[in-house]
């Protein structure tokens, strides 16, 4: 296990900032303003070490009674999103503790996990990058067809994992080893170099890089 730190946040969109050499750096802005520790898991009580984080306000009347009791035990108002992060540094956290953007220092390497944009039902060319058929004489409505998908009498079926048309996107993805350009504690915003998964308004998890850089 590692000493990974984490924050839940909402993707606000992309911008650009100047670096010390006078170059524009593309950054993604992430709102991490309402993070709070809702539970601390220890070896003695739970069999493993982890910290549970809550993010985003929610109407208390829309929270189930078991969850309402969970939040009340932690001494925090109900939160819309919960996530649990494994870490060895559970002694540094306690239930009800608020976490700010400065949990990550400028220059820190992070992994960002989010849900990618959904593209709907897509064909094999868009979804998998298949080559289209030649657009010339003799071609009849074949330009974007996938071609043969199976064998003959043996194995008499299409093998699992065959790349075919289907729903594209809206899956969990992680972009690794991104750099924190700045941490605005007053406004609760992290500026992370580069692009991260998901649309504007999407919920993301920012964690210390597992592979380093």
Swiss-Prot record:
GO terms for cellular component: cytosolic large ribosomal subunit. GO terms for molecular function: rRNA binding; structural constituent of ribosome. Pfam families: Ribosomal_L3 (PF00297). GO terms for biological process: translation. It comes from the Bacteria. Belongs to the universal ribosomal protein uL3 family. Part of the 50S ribosomal subunit. Forms a cluster with proteins L14 and L19. One of the primary rRNA binding proteins, it binds directly near the 3'-end of the 23S rRNA, where it nucleates assembly of the 50S subunit. This is Large ribosomal subunit protein uL3. It comes from Bifidobacterium longum (strain NCC 2705).
